[in-house]
């Protein structure tokens, strides 16, 4: 069965800070970093927000959709260079330093990057969560994406796949699926049955 991973871009604005702090001598750079990351956030989201309309008008396999994906991929590559430079220099900056949107930009760019990059920065994000600097819900999405890329089952059920033959969406395989909602609740995610309604998926939790 041919399938493709749906790039999740539902941003609710509820992401909290992922911050490691920056050197005191760099405090004056906060405004500059905030502006940079605000710009990156906009670039990451604005083309993805066009996907629904382009698909509805032209179809998923249309030239228009392929052109849009080419644009997204080019923007992602540029954003990734900028974000990894920031992360390598300052660590994972929190909303107290770069604002909530700037903080979300860090997550989005890594979430939309390649497997090697995701695996590199996953430990940094884990540490941020342990130190109360990041929301577990953000980490859950990255954990799931990396797990699937490694050929494993996802943990939180955040990743949705699409059957390209039927056009229908479905939940990618989940480890210990019967207890997935407990894990989702532990990181502040809604029950899976509610989450998948965004893709019109009729989902029932398996019996324990």
Predicted regions span which residues?
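Bacterial Sec-dependent N-terminal signal peptides
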Residues: 1-25
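A cross-kingdom marker for long, charged
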Residues: 179-208
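Residue-level detector of secondary-structure boundary/capping sites
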Residues: 3, 74, 116, 174-175
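An amphipathic alpha-helical core segment
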Residues: 126-190
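N-terminal helix-rich structural modules
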Residues: 22-150, 157
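A C-terminal-region feature
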Residues: 22-32, 158-164, 173, 196, ...
């Amino acid at each position: 069965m041919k399938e493709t991973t749906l790039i999740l871009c539902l941003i609710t604005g509820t992401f909290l800070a992922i911050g490691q702090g920056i050197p005191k001598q760099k405090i004056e750079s906060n405004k500059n970093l905030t502006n940079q990351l605000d710009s990156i956030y906009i670039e990451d989201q604005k083309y993805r927000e066009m996907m629904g309309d382009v698909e509805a008008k032209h179809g998923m396999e249309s030239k228009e959709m392929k052109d849009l994906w080419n644009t997204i991929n080019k923007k992602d590559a540029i954003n990734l260079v900028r974000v990894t430079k920031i992360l390598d220099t300052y660590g994972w900056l929190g909303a107290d330093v770069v604002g909530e949107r700037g903080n979300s930009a860090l997550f989005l760019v890594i979430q939309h990057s390649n497997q090697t990059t995701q695996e590199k920065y996953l430990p940094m994000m884990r540490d941020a969560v342990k130190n109360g600097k990041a929301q577990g819900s953000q980490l859950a999405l990255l954990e799931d994406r990396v797990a699937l890329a490694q050929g494993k089952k996802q943990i939180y059920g955040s990743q949705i796949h699409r059957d390209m033959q039927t056009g229908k969406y479905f939940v990618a395989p989940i480890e210990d699926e019967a207890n997935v909602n407990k894990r989702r609740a532990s990181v502040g995610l809604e029950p899976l049955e509610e989450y998948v309604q965004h893709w019109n998926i009729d989902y029932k939790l398996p019996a324990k």
